């Protein structure tokens, strides 16, 4: 039930893999990877984009190599609308959509989907409620009809609300005993202390207990609307036919009274190192997260920071962090860095799981690597390896319909342009070591770190 931190800043990634944040486990190569043929990547000539009169944006790309189709998307209704007293309401509402509608109960909805091997699921992040589904192309009308039915006329039957509440509370109880989850949540509370991103989207036990069935009905009535909704459809269907099906299922939906989401306040950066520890008795492992706030996805520093992060703690055996903390010193079960970027401010952090007796030693090594990263940046060879890996893995991330759907949502969410993936290799290769160094120095300040530890 607990959610990884990148979900908070990158709501779309709940339904699809962000191809701009590629994992790095390729064999090192000092040569540039060959550029994929531009015609094989999504681009303006094969991405269909249209906005319906009611505000729904559809992006579609045909792929007739398999008989299936994927839908992914989001509605502008996330936890930013939650009050502190009922935090988790957006997620509770999203997870309750499939529990019954005005026309059918839960069993009837799932029986209809499972009878043709289709699936549909929902969840919520800070900014959006997200959905993901798949079916055979011939069953796309059924999939879209189900989507329309549950987002427009959910019933939230009381029996199902209480069952869902019990499941959510169980998930939160598990989270409270998970050292990695608690370290991640505590890190957010430090870095985003005076910002909405400090709050976990799935709430706390007391806030979930406070939510009533009528709260779900009210949240849906107020905040679910077609304006700002985005749907990506990829697979064995012509884009024009996909558009006609979306128009048929959702074209007459409207909610003109939906309010805009509250604007994100500016983030106040840390002025000193803040260390916070969460005690969880009976554990044999401690998890720590050390880091800072990071760039938003549209910031100019994002791509240099992403390439630098690959060197710091992703590429090969988890980069410099993995080599120093795990391979050479043997202090960690795992150690890596991550760059989480979305609509608002992101985070740049190093995570490690260690023996509780090794927390101080591992923390010192990580802080030493941060200081070295900020002082010297990356070498030309390290950057070249990272660039080759980014470029070489892009086609792999776009081999599946789900990967392409994620790419289309990425383009729309962050206004990257329909030709973004055709330009991607050139953008990556244009980054210089100095740009990586400047990005590192902008965000990492070794004397101003957030350090979160959870364990015995």
Protein language model features and the residues they cover:
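Intrinsic disorder/low-complexity segments
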Residues: 4, 15-16, 23, 30
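Carbohydrate-associated surface elements
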Residues: 236
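Active-site SXXK
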Residues: 88-101
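Non-catalytic beta-strand/loop surface segments
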Residues: 5-9, 29-84, 99-141, 162, ...
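A common structural junction motif
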Residues: 149-156, 249-257, 368-377
């Amino acid at each position: 039930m607990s959610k990884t931190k990148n979900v908070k800043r990158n709501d779309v990634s709940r339904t699809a893999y962000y191809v701009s944040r590629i994992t790095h486990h390729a064999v090192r190569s000092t040569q540039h990877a060959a550029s994929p043929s531009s015609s094989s990547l999504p681009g303006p000539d094969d991405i269909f984009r249209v906005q319906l009169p009611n505000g729904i944006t559809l992006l579609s790309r045909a792929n007739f190599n398999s008989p299936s189709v994927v839908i992914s998307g989001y509605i502008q209704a996330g936890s930013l609308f939650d009050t502190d007293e009922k935090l988790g309401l957006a997620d509770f509402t999203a997870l309750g959509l499939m529990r019954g509608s005005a026309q059918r109960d839960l069993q009837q909805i799932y029986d209809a989907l499972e009878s043709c091997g289709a699936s549909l699921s929902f969840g919520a992040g800070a900014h959006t409620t997200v959905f993901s589904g798949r079916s055979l192309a011939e069953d796309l009308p059924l999939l879209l009809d189900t989507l329309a039915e549950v987002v427009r006329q959910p019933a939230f039957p009381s029996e199902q609300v209480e069952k869902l509440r019990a499941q959510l509370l169980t998930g939160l109880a598990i989270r409270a005993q998970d050292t990695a989850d608690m370290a991640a949540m505590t890190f957010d509370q430090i870095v985003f202390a005076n910002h909405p991103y400090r709050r976990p989207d799935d709430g706390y036990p007391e806030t979930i207990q406070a939510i009533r069935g009528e709260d779900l009905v009210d949240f849906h009535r107020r905040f679910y609307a077609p304006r700002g909704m985005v749907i990506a459809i990829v697979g064995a269907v012509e884009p024009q036919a996909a558009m006609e099906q979306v128009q048929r299922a959702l074209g007459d939906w409207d909610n003109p009274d939906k309010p805009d989401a509250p604007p994100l306040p500016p983030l106040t950066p840390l002025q000193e190192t803040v260390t916070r520890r969460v005690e969880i008795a009976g554990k044999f492992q401690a998890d720590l997260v050390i880091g800072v706030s990071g760039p938003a996805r549209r910031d100019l520093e994002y791509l240099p920071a992403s390439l630098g992060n690959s060197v710091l703690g992703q590429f090969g055996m988890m980069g410099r962090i993995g080599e120093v903390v795990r391979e050479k010193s043997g202090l960690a079960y795992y150690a890596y860095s991550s760059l989480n970027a979305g609509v608002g401010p992101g985070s740049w952090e190093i995570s490690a799981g260690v023996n509780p007796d090794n927390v101080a030693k591992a923390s010192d090594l990580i802080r030493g690597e941060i200081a070295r990263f900020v002082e010297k940046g990356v070498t030309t060879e390290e950057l070249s390896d990272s660039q080759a890996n980014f470029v070489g893995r892009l086609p792999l991330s776009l081999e599946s319909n789900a990967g392409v759907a994620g790419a289309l949502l990425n383009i729309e969410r962050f206004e990257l342009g329909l030709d973004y993936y055709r330009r991607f290799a050139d953008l990556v290769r244009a980054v210089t070591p100095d740009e990586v160094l400047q990005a590192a120095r902008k965000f990492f300040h070794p004397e101003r770190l957030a350090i979160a530890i959870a364990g015995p």
